[in-house]
Design a protein with these regions (language model features):
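Flexible "arm" and connector segments at domain edges
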Residues: 1-69, 73-113
């Protein structure tokens, strides 16, 4: 698959493009149109893609699931870019949790009201 961005670089490259779309013409860019519509439109898309991912996961077609997961990741990255949350912050949080029991990590989280 010549010409593809190496997997380790894909998220960062995509994030940079999503940042650039903040100043793009909403008539020419799907992402710019989401930014113009605001957070609620982005959150709605994430919800739709999450539901579609769940439906795809119930079926044996792994390729369909991969496509839905890509849609979900993409729209989550749109939200991250809108909020200026760099992917390194999320991977840093995952690294912080790595090697810790899920039960122990959850118990150590600050309680919210």
């Amino acid at each position: 698959m010549a010409g593809l961005i190496p997997p380790g670089d894909m998220i960062g490259e995509l994030y940079r493009v999503l940042q650039d779309r903040k100043t793009a013409d909403p008539g020419a860019s799907y992402v710019a149109s989401l930014y113009r519509k605001g957070s609620d439109a982005i959150l709605k898309k994430i919800g739709e893609e999450a539901a579609e991912t769940l439906i795809a996961a119930k079926n044996p077609d792994d390729e369909a699931l991969v496509r839905e997961l890509a849609d979900l990741w993409f729209h989550t990255l749109v939200l991250m870019a809108q909020r200026d949350i760099e992917p390194a912050r999320v991977t840093g949080e995952l690294a912080r949790r790595f090697g810790t029991s899920g039960h122990a990590e959850k118990a150590a989280r600050p309680r919210t009201s």
